[in-house]
């Protein structure tokens, strides 16, 4: 029988993941900072999912960007439906901690968001981010349009050149299209660092500038 530690560096195969549940976790559907809904159809707005380590600090990075309509913490990219935080932390769901970013393309470009993403963490660390180790901390971009996907791949290649010049290794970010189902995290994780100003934030970038989105 596999122990929990077996999934710190390996995504569970089909049949190994926890079963999850049909019912979504309870959610207070109002953003603590801007009052916008966390869940909805978001007609006329664009969406993307970013994974860049612990979602507490990651969500704050994006809710501060002008033009972002709403953000939410959640789980994506794995197999377990409606997983809980403890289940995701076990490594047995296949999910990474992710942030749903809903934004107005007339107010902020996707390239600007990509630059924020790349510069806010170290995308070369594989199944960890700083001291946070496990598949749930892997770097990821889950795109909702083909144009986003192309832009994300191009930005990865451009940033790889800068990272290589600075002595970093290969980018390990998972870039996918279409985006997988985004499962909202428990209420306490939503806008966590606004509720807990002295809460943990392990997010740290490389200090290497990303050459895209400079004029956005």
UniProtKB/Swiss-Prot annotation:
Record's signal peptide: none
Database matches in HAMAP family: MsrA (MF_01401)
PANTHER family xref list: MITOCHONDRIAL PEPTIDE METHIONINE SULFOXIDE REDUCTASE
Family: Belongs to the MsrA Met sulfoxide reductase family.
Active-site residues annotated for this sequence: 54
Originating gene: msrA
Keywords: Oxidoreductase
Native source organism of the sequence: Xanthomonas oryzae pv. oryzae (strain PXO99A)
GO cellular component terms attached to this protein's record: cytoplasm
GO biological process: cellular response to oxidative stress; protein modification process
Catalyzed reactions per annotation: L-methionyl-[protein] + [thioredoxin]-disulfide + H2O = L-methionyl-(S)-S-oxide-[protein] + [thioredoxin]-dithiol; [thioredoxin]-disulfide + L-methionine + H2O = L-methionine (S)-S-oxide + [thioredoxin]-dithiol
GO-annotated molecular function: L-methionine-(S)-S-oxide reductase activity; peptide-methionine (S)-S-oxide reductase activity
Identification of the protein by name: Peptide methionine sulfoxide reductase MsrA
EC number: 1.8.4.11
Function, in words: Has an important function as a repair enzyme for proteins that have been inactivated by oxidation. Catalyzes the reversible oxidation-reduction of methionine sulfoxide in proteins to methionine.
UniProt keyword annotation of Nucleotidyltransferase present: no
InterPro entries reported in the protein's UniProt record: Met_Sox_Rdtase_MsrA_dom, Met_Sox_Rdtase_MsrA_sf, MsrA_MetSO_reductase
Pfam family, one: PMSR
């Amino acid at each position: 029988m596999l122990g929990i530690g077996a999934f710190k560096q390996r995504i569970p195969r089909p049949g190994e993941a926890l079963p999850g549940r049909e019912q979504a976790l309870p959610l207070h559907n109002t953003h603590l900072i801007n009052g916008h809904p966390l869940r909805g159809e978001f007609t006329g707005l664009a969406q993307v999912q970013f994974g860049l380590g612990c979602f507490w600090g990651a969500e704050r990075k994006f809710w501060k960007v002008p033009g972002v309509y709403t953000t939410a913490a959640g789980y994506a990219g794995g197999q377990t439906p409606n997983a809980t935080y403890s289940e995701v932390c076990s490594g047995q769901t296949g999910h990474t901690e992710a942030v749903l970013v809903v934004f107005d393309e007339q107010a902020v470009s996707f390239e600007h968001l990509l630059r924020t993403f790349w510069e806010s963490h170290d995308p070369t660390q594989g199944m960890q981010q700083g001291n946070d180790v496990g598949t749930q901390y892997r770097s990821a971009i889950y795109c909702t349009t083909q144009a986003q996907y192309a832009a994300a791949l191009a930005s990865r290649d451009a940033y790889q050149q800068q990272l290589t010049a600075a002595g970093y290794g290969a980018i390990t970010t998972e870039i996918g299209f279409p985006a997988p189902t985004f499962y909202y995290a428990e209420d306490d994780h939503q806008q966590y660092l606004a509720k807990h100003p002295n809460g943990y934030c392990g997010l740290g970038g490389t200090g290497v500038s990303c050459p895209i989105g400079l004029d956005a």
